[in-house]
Amino acid sequence: MKEADLITLRRQLHQIPELALQEKETHALLLKTIQGLPQTYFTIRTLPDLPTALLVKVQGRDPQRTIGYRTDIDALPVTEKTGLPFASKHSGIAHACGHDIHMTVALGILSYFAEHQPKDNLIFFFQPAEESKNGGKLAYDMGAFTGDWHIDEFYGLHDRPDLPAGTISTRLGTLFAGTTEINVDLIGKSGHAALPQNANDMIVAAASFISQIQTVVARNVGPTDSAVITFGLMRAGTIRNVIAGRAHLEGTLRGFTQQQIDFLQQRIRDIGQGIAASFNCQVKVALNQGGYYPVENNDKLTKNFIQVMKDDPDVTFVDTKPVMTGEDFGYLLNKIPGTMFWLGVNDPDSQLHAADFSPDEAALVPGVTAVVHFLEHRMLEKV
């Protein structure tokens, strides 16, 4: 695809953002675009139990392995405020995380290999439900990557607004944190504010729970490691002179390794049990990680990826640090070795998930070219 074709496609995708597992228009446009490419080496597959997902296998001419490339396709419940002439047509929904860029780059790569048969097999996975609903986990757990669709190594990108357009960046180890949703219900006994001895105040219990949780990162995580536990919502009480008999908390846990996350999850449960004993109340702790595992890049594959990018005269590569945001590609990389990387899109005055986020389309061609060059180089290497 030429740059003009990529830009046109990106703008079409940008105008039809859809939420997780509802990506019907997006799926239809992707399928139409893919069916418009030369089909000589293609097998196109849909998943009955995940109907907005799409897989495309490109048959290699002398396959020694199967390399996967994944892009997410869903959008966010955000009202777009970019002022672009091709802004979202769907009220209250926007591609505020740049998945339109992700899809366009993937289609550009696919279009190249439609005309230039790869040495190894390639499988492109157009994944629904990254922002929520665990689309990667759903696909893997239903056996999408078994049999003829087995993948030996997996790659994928995420756009990054604070890097110049077309810049590539990644690192060994963790790139994105793993995340866990925390929901806590504390159940005591309501009563008159003047008679606290006859009630069991869950505002006090909840405050103690939150305070104790803050010691977990400070005292159970090494000073050179990183983790975050944040509570962003608390609901309790109905009026000033009634002691609250119930409290509800919602928060998030983030860490850079699954071992660390497992440990922190258990500490939250332990503190919940302690609060229940201390305040003679019920504490129900629900932790939901779903598919949001840490995005842990495979050392061997990522060293190779970085070296290829550094050796490519057309690529600007920069080092990066891990980030505390989450990405459900982590679940797939927990099952299949691979690498995730950043693609700079040059919107430094905005950020991912912001209503005014507007990635630079100048990143499209460099993104496609860099990945094509990497895949061709990778396929020349011995298994």
Swiss-Prot record:
Pfam families referenced in this protein's UniProt entry, alphabetically: M20_dimer (PF07687), Peptidase_M20 (PF01546)
Molecular-function GO term, any one: N-acetyldiaminopimelate deacetylase activity
A Gene Ontology annotation in the biological process aspect, one of them, is:
diaminopimelate biosynthetic process
What the entry lists under Gene3D superfamilies is as follows: 3.30.70.360, Zn peptidases (3.40.630.10)
- Transferase: is it a keyword of this entry? no
Question: Is Transport there in the keyword field?
Answer: no
Documented EC number(s): 3.5.1.47
List the catalytic residues.
D72, E131 (proton acceptor)
Q: In which pathway does it act?
A: Amino-acid biosynthesis; L-lysine biosynthesis via DAP pathway; LL-2,6-diaminopimelate from (S)-tetrahydrodipicolinate (acetylase route): step 3/3
* Annotated InterPro entries: AcetylDAP_deacetylase (IPR023905), Amidohydrolase (IPR017439), Bact_exopeptidase_dim_dom (IPR036264), Peptidase_M20 (IPR002933), Peptidase_M20_dimer (IPR011650)
Q: What are the entry keywords?
A: Amino-acid biosynthesis, Diaminopimelate biosynthesis, Hydrolase, Lysine biosynthesis
Can you state which reaction this protein catalyses? N-acetyl-(2S,6S)-2,6-diaminopimelate + H2O = (2S,6S)-2,6-diaminopimelate + acetate
- Write out the function statement from the record: Catalyzes the conversion of N-acetyl-diaminopimelate to diaminopimelate and acetate.
The text of the family note is: Belongs to the peptidase M20A family. N-acetyldiaminopimelate deacetylase subfamily.
Q: Which NCBIfam families match?
A: amidohydrolases (TIGR01891)
Query: Could you identify this protein by its name?
Result: N-acetyldiaminopimelate deacetylase
- Annotated organism of origin: Lacticaseibacillus paracasei (strain ATCC 334 / BCRC 17002 / CCUG 31169 / CIP 107868 / KCTC 3260 / NRRL B-441) (Lactobacillus paracasei)
